[in-house]
Amino acid sequence: MHILVTGFAPFDNQNINPSWEAVTQLEDIIGTHTIDKLKLPTSFKKVDNIINKTLASNHYDVVLAIGQAGGRNAITPERVAINIDDARIPDNDDFQPIDQAIHLDGAPAYFSNLPVKAMTQSIINQGLPGALSNSAGTYVCNHVLYHLGYLQDKHYPHLRFGFIHVPYIPEQVIGKPDTPSMPLEKIVAGLTAAIEAISNDEDLRIALGTTE
């Protein structure tokens, strides 16, 4: 399959974003998949147009977006995105939408159509912390996952799409002893394992849910 993997530019006064750092280190061929890479701005207003133009000019079987989730201690494939922008902080264009629908004609939520449990289990099988997430937040990460679901629903019925959040890397948590992080090479290994699992036509039926 031809897979587009995206990462984000740094945001919130940081000078590094582990999502893009990890994406740049992925191999160009993973299993039977050909990988293209794209850096997205952390911008509510810009990402949609960039994704739209990229999909209009290239054929991709899968789009897998990667984002930073500071404070998480695992690599977390996302199950679902919701139709809301509610930014705790402004984006890199100093734009801070609050309680705004992403697409007025979109569904309340879009579920990733990738085998997210198989991807999560593949990460865990590498001896890495992995967990299935049921919330992509309400910032630009959720926005991108929702927009991909919207595009699949309205324009690209055969497109497969998903999102994975990754933790901070160690240099981001210097002076923050209680904040979890993960070495970049382990994040790359986890993403590679997850991408390999995309080949699964059906997802695993295993218990990876939460009680709260």
Curated annotation (Swiss-Prot):
Compartmental location: Cytoplasm
Entry's Gene Ontology BP terms: proteolysis
Signal peptide annotation: none
Record's GO cellular component terms: cytosol
PANTHER family referenced in this protein's UniProt entry, alphabetically: PROTEASE FAMILY C15 PYROGLUTAMYL-PEPTIDASE I-RELATED, PYROGLUTAMYL-PEPTIDASE I
Active site residues according to the UniProt entry: E78, C141, H165
CDD domains (alphabetical): Peptidase_C15 (cd00501)
InterPro entries: Peptidase_C15 (IPR000816), Peptidase_C15-like (IPR016125), Peptidase_C15-like_sf (IPR036440), PGP-I_bact-type (IPR029762), PGPEP1_Cys_AS (IPR033694), PGPEP1_Glu_AS (IPR033693)
Native source species: Staphylococcus aureus (strain JH9)
Catalytic activity, reaction form: Release of an N-terminal pyroglutamyl group from a polypeptide, the second amino acid generally not being Pro
Keywords: Cytoplasm, Hydrolase, Protease, Thiol protease
PROSITE patterns: PYRASE_CYS, PYRASE_GLU
Any GO molecular function: pyroglutamyl-peptidase activity
Protein name: Pyrrolidone-carboxylate peptidase
Biological function: Removes 5-oxoproline from various penultimate amino acid residues except L-proline.
Predominant place of localization: cytoplasm
Assembly with partners or alone: Homotetramer.
